Amino acid sequence: MGEPERRQSLSKLDGFSMPNICLGTSPLGGMPDTYGYDVDEAQAVATIRHALDRGLTFIDTSNEYGDGESERRIGTVLRESGASGHRVLIASKADPARGQRILDGDRVRESFAESAARLGVDRLDVYYLHDPERFDFADMVKPGSSLDAIRELKAQGLVGLIGVAGGDLGEMRRYLDTGLMDIILNHNHFTLLDRSATPLITDCVSAGVAFVNAAPYASGILAKPLASSPRYRYQAPTPTLVATVEWLHRICGTFGVPLAALALQFSTRDPRIRSTVVGVSAPQRIDELMRNAARSIPPELCELVEDRLAPQTG
């Protein structure tokens, strides 16, 4: 497979359209408490290098992933001969300082400066306010606070698209309704197991706002064998959910299709989704991702899964 499909984003970035697969790098920051495993620097750097070599040139990170380790490791690769000539699209996120719970205007500017320094860049193509559900909405949007600060960064040419990235659908909608968002990232709510982001996606499209879907594997359970005790939304799955995933593995097996391929393409084949963020922890996972993205999936399999799961979701 060559480079991922490049979809015409609702907003263009310097003539660079948005690839429909984005490399998620929170695992590459070394976050064992979140994922149940660690990734050391050598493995992280090798993974990022391999992703670029395979044509994955849209990278998502955050100031707080691994206390900045994700960004620093990405920066190590980007500094290597200009990432070997790759045109890399970088998305990062504004976060509070370590151990703090404040994301005011000053902190947004500080967070941007920290991220840019670690990454070794002067400009970020996409910049989000991260997990805004952690903060009071009125404080975030009042004059001089976070929203104004991120808009100023855009006006200064330091960032391209601006938006919010988080898991709370209600909070995402509040920011969408400001009319000031270019892009919204939501995770774990548009998967085979949960379609609850559908109304938000529809409204983003209507408003001309790019929607980015993160965690199509629901934090692992749709990509790993159940014997490995994968997590669902970063928690242990319920017995009912495990039974559903067991059925998915069986039905996919009858068609010779990995469940991970079906789960990935559920997002990547939806034209409303501008890009799908997939967290990857090792070079061989990049190869698996590319195979799953390219795999042919019989329509009959999709129909069977929809008949079983669609009525349960929403």
Language model region names:
Residues M1-V88:
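N-terminal binding-site loop/beta-alpha segment at the start of enzyme catalytic domains
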Residues A116-D136:
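Active-site groove signature of glycoside hydrolases
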Residues Y37-A51, L103-R118, D168-R174:
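Short, acidic/polar
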Residues G2, P132-T313:
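Beta/alpha (TIM)-barrel catalytic core signal, keyed to glycine-rich beta->alpha loops juxtaposed to Asp/Glu
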Residues S62-E71, A97-I102, F135-A138, F190-R195:
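Acidic-and-aromatic substrate-binding clefts and catalytic sites of carbohydrate-active enzymes
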Residues H86-G99:
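A short, structured active-site edge motif that brings together acidic residues
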Residues F16-I21, G55-T57, S84-V88, V121-D125, ...:
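Short, well-ordered coil/turn segments that N-cap beta-strands
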Residues L23, A44, I59, I74, ...:
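Conserved, mostly hydrophobic/aromatic
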